[in-house]
């Protein structure tokens, strides 16, 4: 049996690669893929090892090592040659040029490149067959290429800080390790540590490999980055737990030794360590496409289908109408390019960037632009507990003295004014908590509030120190008046801490003070303090103690007991107290009370969880902490709502076995990590489907990953929060990984898509709102942009079908798409949310697309058609004013385009030269362009909302007002600036020609207000089903 114990699991020290016979290339690839898949499945399995169960003799035999002298130098060299260095294999990284190419040629850019190439092809055909071709298609090709390159560079720059997960794993590796080889202690590079090496660690060291301890003195390790446990964990040679992650005789690679010393045997190195497996798991995970990327891909397919369909239809139609095949090809290319919204790529990029900047101001740092929108699609949030839902600092929550439970202040401000302080018992309790305490404030922090001051010492002692400093008096003064003369530090065997102090009165005697596990403290006591008076311990007191202990423990709080003894006068000042061979009394102490501590919820979290619930988002707690604590916090923040019961609580209330509880009666469930170990996918799916309120406690990194995959399997868009190394696989696998900026490890930050700078869960809800808003606003922006496609395409179609002079040229289309439409489209990114944004269910990425048939129907079939009518109305008005009635324009195209025909007659017999005709044609094209700008005013205003009336939403978006002014001034500038007739073929217009479009603008506004009114009055009615995009 290997180190991992079970068949089908990876043995960490089986580090020699197996040889395979050479096979064909295709088969090799298939084998490789299958192997990768199998490896990933094995990585997801729980850590299985038996080294923690072995006796020292068995350990010595297994690794062929002397437990006092270690390996010989020769033996260590052989193992190093065979097993390889003690390093974590870095994953293959994507080269920067590949990332840049993805920005330049991926997604929407591909559509624009296609447009640019088609334009160039059209220009080449014109050059080949015409003596003096127009250069419109060449200009269009160049402009499209520039647009793609500029926006590609911009996007690459925004996402240049891509995640390099293994960098921080490298940083975590200690450089030197102290090993014993051939009976001698020696410092070696950590890469040279081998399986079976005898290693020594001390406080402040990082553990160089996975170790099985054979001896330890007061050793504590910080496993928080690996298991999520906030308290330092004691380490000893004893086998204390079946689970290798929880037993005390294993130390894990790259965790920190906080205090004490230990000696151990290396049982895994490099990739085979628990941390190495997490690294492999994180870097080997396949990351899916972001919802917004999928939406843009869907949009491209849609636009491409529409463009090709129209292009091919009119190519066939132009051939039927008698055009030559070359002209028909030019038409085909022209129609396809006219369908490409050139400005949309830049608009989407700028919208996402603006939102990312806005979120950064709200403490959400977005590493991947597309993650902004993903957060808005989120339907499930798997949140870590410590530091995300809680304040990440132990705080005194309750006290029990004088037979009464008192509540302390756990708010983030901590005023400490919530209970009576007149009792002598409280006076004694405060003194013990302050004196029998090794924590201290760091220097030069007097100006900071007590709650914000940094301390030395463990979390519980620091909590007591701050609490006494706030609620009683200066601890430093108290310690000065009562100097410590002897101490027994807390250890996991004794489960108490004892200190002896000189009394501050003039008696020159000592007081012994003790704190520790309540049941242990009670064993030392024969009396108790009640209202300052000492009484003999009795059954009533013991029962009251037991009830208080159970009540506070049931709240998920860490409870400590406190007692004291005034030592007799024979132990006066100068007595040599010996804590190794006890020479003073340690029995018949006086019990004072209990103090309980908890890492309290953040103030803003309950409201944030409530907002998630009303927004249809399921919040699941996934923590490495104890189930009782996890459940208490879940109830405190509303993940388990008031009145909701678990199966255990229903069973207790009805006094029936759990097996008889109706599953539908228990809406909430607390799942222990041990239960998840052997659970099947179907059973996990049932838990996730049947319980709206879920807490997973004591989970391992692999289990967090399995939970995320389970949610995704059920179709959820999953956001995961985490701060430890243990969270990084789940962060990477999630649709959006959210790391903690303050408490987060480097690994978690680099596996994540987004970082919460203030570590606050409430910031996620802000992010969800921003994500939904950007999706709404992108929809509005696309709706606005696509609408002008119809008045851009129809002139070309009428030019082919009706044979009229071209109403709108290529250059003027570019002026709309990359000029007048850009700022207004971007201004919609600044639009504030509609009132229902956090009250509707999360969008379904499969059905609720960014661009759906209803949006296309509105943009192309309704608003776009009104705009096209406006354009043609202006076009025919100008030509009529110049003598060409609409009916006489039909079929005039060939004569109109004939350069050698200089006596073309209008409806009134006036003759027009080719030059004169072109001036009128370009004036009409300028007027058509201006008309589109005027009707786009109305389109922009109606795009502000999808359901609400403009009168509900208001006109508070100043950027949008600026957008209307900008497009109007730009249109005027292009029309009236001298020289534009040569540069862009734009001519000055009469003021009355600007007014032709006003009635159509009013029509668009009134039409859309009536549509939205019908949607509001008849939810789920025909109008909503067909037009609510």
From Swiss-Prot:
It is found in: Cell membrane. PROSITE patterns: ATPASE_E1_E2. The keyword Transit peptide does not apply. One of its GO terms (biological process) is regulation of membrane potential. Residues 1-37, 223-242 are annotated as: Disordered. One of its GO terms (cellular component) is cell projection. Residues 1-95, 161-296, 347-778, 830-849, 945-957, 1013-1029 are cytoplasmic. Keywords: ATP-binding, Cell membrane, Ion transport, Magnesium, Membrane, Metal-binding, Nucleotide-binding, Phosphoprotein, Potassium, Potassium transport, Sodium, Sodium transport, Sodium/potassium transport, Translocase, Transmembrane, Transmembrane helix, Transport. The keyword tRNA-binding does not apply. Residues 223-237 have a biased composition (Polar residues). The modification Phosphoserine is found at residue 949. Gene3D superfamilies: Calcium-transporting ATPase, cytoplasmic domain N (3.40.1110.10), Calcium-transporting ATPase, cytoplasmic transduction domain A (2.70.150.10), Calcium-transporting ATPase, transmembrane domain (1.20.1110.10), HAD superfamily/HAD-like (3.40.50.1000). Specifically expressed in testis. Found in very low levels in skeletal muscle. Expressed in mature sperm (at protein level). Mg(2+) binds at residues 723, 727. Residues 117-139, 317-328, 799-808, 873-924, 977-991 are extracellular. It holds the Pfam family Hydrolase. Residues 90-92 are annotated as: Interaction with phosphoinositide-3 kinase. The chain crosses the membrane at residues 96-116, 140-160, 297-316, 329-346, 779-798, 809-829, 850-872, 925-944, 958-976, 992-1012. Specifically inhibited by an endogenous cardiac glycoside, ouabain. Residues 18-36 have a biased composition (Basic residues). This is the catalytic component of the active enzyme, which catalyzes the hydrolysis of ATP coupled with the exchange of sodium and potassium ions across the plasma membrane. This action creates the electrochemical gradient of sodium and potassium ions, providing the energy for active transport of various nutrients. Plays a role in sperm motility. PANTHER family: SODIUM/POTASSIUM-TRANSPORTING ATPASE SUBUNIT ALPHA, SODIUM_POTASSIUM-TRANSPORTING ATPASE SUBUNIT ALPHA-4. This is Sodium/potassium-transporting ATPase subunit alpha-4. It comes from Homo sapiens. The lineage of its organism: Eukaryota, Metazoa, Chordata, Craniata, Vertebrata. The gene is ATP1A4.
């Amino acid at each position: 049996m290997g180190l991992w114990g079970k068949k089908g699991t990876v043995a960490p020290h089986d580090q020699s690669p197996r040889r395979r016979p050479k096979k064909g290339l295709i088969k090799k690839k298939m084998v490789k893929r299958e192997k990768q898949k199998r490896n990933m499945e094995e990585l997801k399995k729980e850590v299985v090892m038996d080294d923690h169960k072995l006796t020292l003799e068995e350990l010595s035999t297994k690794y062929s090592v002397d437990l006092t002298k270690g390996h010989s130098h020769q033996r260590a060299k052989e193992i190093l040659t065979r097993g390889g260095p003690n390093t974590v294999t870095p994953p293959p990284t994507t080269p920067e040029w590949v990332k840049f190419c993805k920005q330049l040629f991926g997604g929407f850019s591909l559509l624009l490149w296609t447009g640019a190439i088609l334009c160039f092809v059209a220009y080449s055909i014109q050059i080949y067959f015409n003596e003096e071709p127009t250069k419109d298609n060449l200009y269009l090709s160049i402009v499209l290429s520039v647009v793609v390159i500029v926006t590609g560079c911009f996007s690459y720059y925004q996402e240049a800080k891509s995640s390099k997960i293994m960098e921080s794993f490298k940083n975590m590796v200690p450089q030197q390790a102290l090993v014993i080889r051939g009976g001698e202690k020696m410092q070696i590079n950590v890469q040279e540590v081998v399986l079976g090496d005898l290693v020594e660690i001390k406080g402040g060291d990082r553990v160089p490999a996975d170790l099985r301890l054979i001896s330890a003195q007061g050793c504590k390790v910080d496993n928080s980055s690996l298991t999520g446990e906030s308290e330092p964990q004691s380490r000893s040679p004893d086998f204390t737990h079946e689970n290798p992650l929880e037993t005390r005789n294993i130390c894990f690679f790259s965790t920190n030794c906080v205090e004490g010393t230990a000696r151990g045997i290396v049982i895994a190195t490099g990739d085979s360590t628990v941390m190495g497996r997490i690294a492999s798991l994180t870097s080997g995970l396949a990351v899916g496409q972001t919802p917004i990327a999928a939406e843009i891909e869907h949009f491209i397919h849609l636009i491409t289908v529409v463009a090709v369909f129209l292009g091919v239809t009119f190519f066939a139609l132009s051939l039927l109408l008698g055009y030559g095949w070359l002209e028909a090809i030019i038409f085909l290319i022209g129609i396809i390019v006219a369908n490409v919204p050139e400005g949309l790529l830049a608009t989407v990029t700028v919208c996402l960037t603006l939102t990312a900047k806005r979120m950064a101001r709200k403490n959400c740092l977005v590493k991947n632009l597309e993650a902004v929108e993903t957060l808005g699609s989120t339907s499930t949030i798997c949140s870590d507990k410590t530091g995300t839902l809680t304040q990440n600092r132990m705080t005194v929550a309750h006290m029990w003295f004088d037979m009464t439970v008192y509540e302390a202040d756990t708010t983030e401000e901590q005023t400490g004014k919530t209970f009576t302080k007149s009792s002598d018992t409280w006076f004694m309790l405060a003194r013990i908590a302050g004196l029998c305490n090794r924590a201290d404030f760091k220097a030069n922090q007097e100006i900071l509030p007590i709650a914000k001051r940094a301390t030395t010492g463990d979390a519980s002692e620091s909590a007591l120190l701050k609490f006494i400093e706030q609620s009683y008096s200066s601890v430093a003064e108290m310690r000065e008046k009562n100097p410590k003369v002897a101490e027994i530090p807390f250890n996991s065997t004794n489960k108490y801490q004892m200190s002896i102090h000189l009394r501050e009165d003039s008696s020159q005697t000592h007081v012994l003070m003790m704190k520790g596990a309540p049941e242990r403290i009670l064993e030392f006591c024969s009396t108790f303090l009640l209202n300052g008076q000492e009484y003999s311990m009795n059954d009533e007191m013991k029962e009251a103690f037991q009830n208080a202990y159970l009540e506070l423990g049931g709240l998920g709080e860490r409870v400590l007991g406190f007692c004291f003894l005034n030592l007799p006068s024979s132990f006066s000042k100068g007595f040599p107290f010996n804590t190794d061979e006890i020479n003073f009394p340690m029995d018949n102490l006086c019990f004072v009370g209990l103090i309980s501590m908890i890492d309290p919820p953040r103030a803003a979290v309950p409201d944030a969880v409530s907002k998630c619930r009303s927004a249809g988002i399921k919040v699941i707690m996934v923590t490495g902490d104890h189930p009782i604590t996890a459940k208490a916090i879940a109830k405190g923040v509303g993940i388990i709502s008031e009145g909701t019961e678990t199966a255990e609580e229903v069973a207790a209330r009805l006094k029936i076995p759990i097996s008889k509880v109706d599953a539908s009666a228990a809406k909430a469930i607390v799942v222990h990590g041990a239960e998840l170990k052997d659970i099947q996918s179907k059973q996990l799916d049932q838990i996730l489907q049947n319980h709206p309120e879920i807490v997973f406690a004591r989970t391992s990194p692999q289990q967090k990953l399995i939970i995320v995959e389970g949610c995704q399997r059920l179709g959820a868009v999953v956001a995961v929060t985490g701060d430890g190394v243990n969270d990084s696989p789940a962060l990477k696998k999630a649709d959006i990984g959210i790391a903690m900026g303050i408490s987060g490890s480097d690994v978690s930050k680099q596996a994540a898509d987004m970082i919460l700078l203030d570590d606050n869960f409430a910031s996620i809800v802000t992010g969800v709102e921003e994500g939904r808003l950007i999706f709404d606003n992108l929809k509005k922006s696309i709706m606005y942009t696509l609408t002008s496609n119809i008045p851009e395409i129809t002139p070309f179609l009428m030019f082919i079908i009706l044979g009229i002079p071209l109403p709108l040229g290529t250059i003027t289309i570019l002026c709309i798409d990359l000029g007048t439409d850009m700022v207004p489209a971007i201004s919609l990114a600044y639009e504030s949310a509609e009132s229902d944004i956090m009250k509707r269910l999360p969008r379904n990425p499969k059905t609720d697309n960014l661009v759906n048939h209803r949006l296309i129907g509105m943009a192309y079939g309704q608003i776009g058609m009104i705009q096209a009518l406006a354009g043609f109305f202006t076009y025919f008005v100008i030509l009529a004013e110049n003598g060409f009635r609409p009916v006489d324009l039909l079929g005039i195209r060939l004569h109109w385009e004939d350069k050698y025909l200089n006596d073309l007659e209008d409806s009134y017999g006036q003759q027009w030269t080719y030059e004169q005709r072109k001036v009128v044609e370009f004036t009409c094209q300028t007027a058509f362009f201006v008309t589109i700008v005027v009707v786009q005013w109305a389109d922009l205003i109606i795009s502000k909302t999808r359901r609400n009336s403009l009168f509900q939403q208001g006109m508070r978006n100043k950027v949008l007002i600026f957008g209307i002014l900008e497009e109007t001034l730009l249109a005027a500038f292009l029309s009236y600036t001298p020289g534009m007739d040569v540069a862009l073929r734009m001519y000055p217009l009469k003021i009355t020609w600007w007014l032709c479009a006003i009635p159509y603008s009013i029509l668009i506004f009134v039409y859309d207000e009536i549509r939205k009114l019908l949607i509001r009055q008849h939810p789920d009615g025909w109008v909503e089903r067909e037009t609510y995009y």
